[in-house]
Amino acid sequence: MAQPYLSIEHIDKSFTRNGLTSTVLRDVNLKIEHGEYISIIGHSGCGKSTVLNIVAGLLDPSLGGVILDGKEVRGPGPDRSMVFQNHSLLPWLTVYENVEVAVNKLFKRSMGKRERRDWIEHNLALVNMGHALNKYPQEISGGMKQRVGIARALAMKPKVLLLDEPFGALDALTRAHLQDEVMKIQKDLGNTMMMITHDVDEAVLLSDRIVMMTNGPSATIGEILDVKLPRPRDRIALADDPEYNHYRRAVLSFLHERHRLH
């Protein structure tokens, strides 16, 4: 049997503070195939971001491990790019230079100067930021900053793109536009994506599978919902789609039941 592209295997995570140990995650198992879009959803404090940070290599698991493309994750690496809710752009660099920093760090030896420039411009064009190469972060909107963050992550040629509530700080219209752009990028490039979200509609719209976490402490995966809506997905058409609303109700029901039990 073929190994999954990304495997989260029997992860536990505990933190000790002032002599007291708290178990945040217990026995988290998840297999992700190449090109899948996975969303993780759950109530605040259920360890969603902890799972993502362990996959990113920013946190070590207390037990278990993460296997990506046949290799164990042991710390951060360029094969896993992360996009945060906060765009994390360097304010003293232009849009182009913010992406250039990452590209030069990874590809200065393997790409020529012209090739690197073309690659940077290509990734900024993917997120419709080709017109703003020379602008500074303070000169562009929040949605544009997040576009640059996504372009920078894609320019690193990651095996997995990790998204930690990437649209959470944006207004509804900007969020919808960016969601549509991410769907198009994933369709065109076939990226493997793993996203943390609190937004049920976002999870159903974007995902191939939705991973629903139980409440903490000792949170784990409660249910996994396969979202079999055909792609490409049109948010307007889906608003009245019975299947879309079935998936939406299933996630809301899980979250409501977990909240009631908590």
Predicted regions and their residues:
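Hydrophobic anchor residue at the start of the ABC signature
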Residues: 150
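Helix-to-loop junction immediately C-terminal to a conserved catalytic motif
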Residues: 56
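The feature captures the beta-strand-to-loop junction immediately N-terminal to the Walker
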Residues: 41-43
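Short coil-to-helix segment of the ABC ATPase nucleotide-binding domain corresponding to the Q-loop/switch region
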Residues: 93-102
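Conserved ABC transporter NBD signature motif
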Residues: 64-76, 112
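A short, flexible loop at the N-terminus of ABC-type nucleotide-binding domains that lies
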Residues: 1-5, 14-27
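Conserved ABC ATPase "signature" region
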Residues: 104, 111-132, 184
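Conserved signature/switch motifs of ABC ATPase nucleotide-binding domains
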Residues: 135-138, 156
